[in-house]
Amino acid sequence: MINNHTLGFPRIGLFRELKVAQEKYWSRKISKEELFSVGKTLRVRHWQQQKELGINYIPVGDFSWYDHVLGTSMLLGNIPKRHKNGNDLVTLDTLFRVARGVAPTGASVSASEMTKWFNTNYHYIVPEFSIKSEFCFSWRQILDEIDEALLLGHQVKPVILGPLTYLWLGKVKGKKFDRLNLLKEILPVYKYLLSEINDRNISWVQIDEPILTLELPEKWKNAFRFAYQSLYGYNSLLLTTYFGSVQHNFSLICELPIQGVHLDLVHGKYDLVFLNSFIPEKWLISLGIINGKNIWKADLVMWFKRLQLFSKLRHSLWIGTSCSLLHVPIDLKLENKISSEVRSWFSFALQKCQELTLLRDALNNSNTVTEDIRVWSQPIHSRKKSAIVHNVDVKERLKSITSNDFKRNNVFSVRKQKQHKNLKLPILPTTTIGSFPQTADIRKARFDFKKGNINHDQYNTFISKHIQNAILKQEKLGIDVLVHGEFERNDMVEYFGEHLNGFVFTEFGWVQSYGSRCVKPPIIIGDVSRSKPISLDWIKYAQTLTSKPVKGMLTGPVTILLWSFVREDLSKKIISRQIALALRDEVLDLEQSGVKIIQIDEPALREGLPLRLSLRNEYLSWAVDSFKLSSSGVCDETQIHTHMCYCEFNDIMNAIVLLDADVITIETSRSDMELLEFFKEFKYPNDIGPGVYDIHSPNIPSIEWIMTLLRQAMHYIPVKRLWVNPDCGLKTRTWDETYYSLENMVRAAKILRKKL
């Protein structure tokens, strides 16, 4: 008998209830108890929804107040000293101080670093390790939630992040040492947790070790053997992998004293005959056959045919999602503004639970394809011929691309001289990354415009006033290169998608990016093209308000691709080129209108990197080409900027050089300029702006702090190529936080200029 399960469920709530409650708590508008009540309501609802849709094993432990990696740090008592508020008591406010640098109680401090969760747009809080790190069971959240779910009568499957993946994701702070040395210290905490779970008579524990998709050093493989031998005997462990194939680590996995393994069949290509022969017969095999990272309906007929024989060969088989459903919206039923034809192609979290149940029942009860799964899968096949999907003009334009379309006219050194003459910027030029605060009145005006409560002219007048205000503030601050503030944009990807052909949009398709930050990714359903200019009028208007240069602000092709739900019938390379051609037209329109600086943001470049080293060069090749296709049509005098944030840059630095952007701005402040260590050996040839303060924390940086970071940067980057800027856009900050932070940033730059 086949069972089904999910690896995790979205936390935020259908209407972002968790986000609302978090932000009210942070601003002291509700109590901790009220926040806890919202969390419990969401958990109870989500467990019940999965149960009603036929899910056998309900995941518990997937809920988090900010991030599940941070939750693991809390459980282990791994809290940086600066966040402890003078004692060892681990509380909810401790968690928020680690994540944000500030909480309703305790002193404000620097937040812990944040970076991307493998190859997704979800961010986790990076664990910090030191030689003096100590661990003890300190956070009962998962046990309390298990008790909640058991009391409600659910068949519970606890979800915990495995010890090796936890250590891999962390960073050593201070004196360098091998963080694997901490494994013996954290295993007793895992043993205690597993014993507590065992006492509750729970049959299976999902222990996530996604680093098994990587090509691990031998010492890490040995650490797996040691760790899981130590954890043997407590519970039936379902070793869970996702985001890729682990076939290269099968020998290691099969050595481990575990009772089952979960494999991602969506993102890892496995031969089922090989699986059956290789994996021990007594083990449970869980097959991730429903895509947890994308919103397309599953071809259940295909999966039925593929799994039918395999299901009869295995004594114990589960089917599940490829990964946690954290990465997809909750319910498709609310999306009434999408045409019925297009909507029939999609499947959100609740619909994916339906898919698992339909397929489970068909495999358990039938030897042939059932009518239920045939009807479910039919729209997948009709979509292939839909006129909505295909555009002949786009296909023809792709064929006309030549090698010259990927090249600037001259090398950077020549361009820099022309740009200096054209722009006349001071040394250590100051700028921001693009967005300014999206206040409640801006969000209301956008909502009213979409609902028809105000007309186009009223909305444009409103946005124009905010742009004017932003320009005035920047001029008062003395910033050198200005931005228009992006007040007309709801999201850096969604906005461009709304103005390109080939996209559709949801009303309630929210997914968590980090903490309370949620995004509503566009869905790429067809060939992409641009019908008319997107950002031109707003940038032109902003430039009329000042004699200083105003940057044209665009989101890059790779980021639009990766931060959308992408179609699966076409390669990412081709889709990215389609987007790049549309953006190339936008870039040339901006240049023709007199815009001297154009920023094309690519924060997702690193995110798209395949987990396997052997596959990375191919991805980086087409990703770089897509950026260059969008940016290389301009003349030498036009300065191209790009921005990247919250990722590990070192392993893509060669690709960043190949982008050939005149200026790159990057996140470095949360890691105390740690990234710049790389520049000791690697001489980045173009201009660079390492972020000098963390915009994801409400803390206002001091002039001295910013000067310290800039002095550090000067050790690695020639001052003539150094820019001064925040880490990222300022959309989520208040105007007071923004103004005073930028004021200190500009003052720091001016003080240092005088000393040079």
UniProtKB/Swiss-Prot annotation:
Which reaction(s) does its UniProt entry say it catalyses? 5-methyltetrahydropteroyltri-L-glutamate + L-homocysteine = tetrahydropteroyltri-L-glutamate + L-methionine
The EC class name is transferase
Query: Which of this chain's residues are annotated to bind L-homocysteine?
Result: 433-435, 486, 601
Q: Which cofactor does it need?
A: Zn(2+)
One term of GO molecular function: zinc ion binding
Q: Please state the pathway this protein functions in, per its UniProt record.
A: Amino-acid biosynthesis; L-methionine biosynthesis via de novo pathway; L-methionine from L-homocysteine (MetE route): step 1/1
UniProt keyword annotation of Repeat present: yes
Q: What does this protein do?
A: Catalyzes the transfer of a methyl group from 5-methyltetrahydrofolate to homocysteine resulting in methionine formation.
Kindly provide the name given to this protein in its UniProt entry: 5-methyltetrahydropteroyltriglutamate--homocysteine methyltransferase
Its ancestry begins with: Bacteria, Pseudomonadati, Pseudomonadota, Gammaproteobacteria, Enterobacterales
